[in-house]
Amino acid sequence: MTLQYYTLNNGRKIPAIGMGCWKLENAADMVYAAIKEGYRLFDCACDYGNEKEVGEGINRAIKDGLVKRKDLFITSKLWNNFHAKENVKKALMKSLSDFNLDYFDLYLMHFPISFKFVPFEEKYPPGFYCGDGDKFIYEDVPIIETWRAMENLVDEGLVKSIGVSNVSGGLLEDLIKAARIKPASLQIEHHPYLQQNKLVEYAQLKGIVVTGYSNFGPLSFLELGNETAKKTQPLYENKTITTIAAKHGKTPFQVLLRWVNQRGIAIIPKSTFPNTLAVNLHVDEFDLTKEDFEEIAKLDRHLRFNDPWTWDKIPTFV
C-alpha cells in the first residue's frame, strides 16, 4: 500500500497513520512487526517508559534490512520535569541514547507544565514524582524558555522538527508569535466526545499538522482508573458509531479512526495484538459520508479525559 503523508510547515513529511507506543506491551516485537507491516510513524515519549524497547525494535528492523532510518518518522516528547533550559538537551540526549538513534524526526513538549527537576539516577522516567513523595512541586519556567531550548536542538540537528502537545489555542497563538522556529505539529486528545473543532481549524490555518490521540475516547483511560472514563459510555458501543459501522461494513474502531484521519488529522492508535496492525494501517481505504460526519458532530460533549486539573488543579484547559 502507499502511505498517505501530511506536509509539515518546514517541508518535512509525517505519515498520516502511525503506531502509538503508550502502554505498548512487548514493545520491541510489536514495533518490529509494525515496520514489517508497513508502519513508518512511531509516537513515543520519555514518560511512556519503554523507549529502550521501542528503539530495540526499530534498530532490529534497520539491521535486518526491513527499512532505512531515513524512511522512519520517530516522535518523542519532553517530560514536565525537564523544562528548564539547562535540562532540555539532557532529556533529549537521554531519550536518543535509550533509542540508540542520532536524531528524532519530531520532538514535542508533552505538556505546558513544569515540574521540579528530578535527576535521571533518582527516578527515570519520573512521571509525577517531584522528589518528595506524592507531592507536586513546580518550577517557574515559562514556556518560551523551554521552547528556545528546543529550537536549539533543531539548530544542532538532534531533532528535525519541534511541536507541542496538550495546549490551548491561546497558548499556541502566543507561542507562534514568540517562536523563532514555529511549531510544526500539535498533538491533542481527539475523539467524538472531544472534537476541539476551533483548535483544530486554527492549527491547520497556521500550517500546523494536528495529531489526535485517544481516538477511542474513554477506553484508553479505564486502565488508569479515570473516574470520568468509568462513567462514560464507550464510543465503540455508541449507537451513532455502531450504526455507521454497520452501514460501511466496518468495526466501530475503524469508523472512529477514519473519522479523525478524514479530517486531515494524523492518527497513532496502539495495536495490542499483531492482527490489528494491518486493520489500523488500512483504515483510510474507505470514506465516511457527509451525513456520517453530521451525525458524529452531534456527539461532541467537550469531554476531556486527560485533564491536568484532575492531577493537582493545574489550569491547562480552564
Curated annotation (Swiss-Prot):
PROSITE patterns: ALDOKETO_REDUCTASE_1. Substrate binds at H110. NAD(+) binds at residues 165-166, 214-223, 270-280. It catalyses: xylitol + NAD(+) = D-xylose + NADH + H(+); xylitol + NADP(+) = D-xylose + NADPH + H(+). It holds the Pfam family Aldo_ket_red. Keywords: Carbohydrate metabolism, NAD, NADP, Oxidoreductase, Xylose metabolism. Its EC number is 1.1.1.307. Disulfide bonds: none annotated. Pathway: Carbohydrate metabolism; D-xylose degradation. The active site is at Y48 (proton donor). One of its GO terms (biological process) is D-xylose catabolic process. Gene3D superfamilies: NADP-dependent oxidoreductase domain. It is an enzyme of class 1 (oxidoreductase). The record marks K77 as: Lowers pKa of active site Tyr. GO terms for molecular function: D-xylose reductase (NADPH) activity. Belongs to the aldo/keto reductase family. Reduces D-xylose into xylitol. Has a preference for NADPH, but can also utilize NADH as cosubstrate. This is NAD(P)H-dependent D-xylose reductase. It comes from Pachysolen tannophilus (Yeast). The lineage of its organism: Eukaryota, Fungi, Dikarya, Ascomycota, Saccharomycotina.
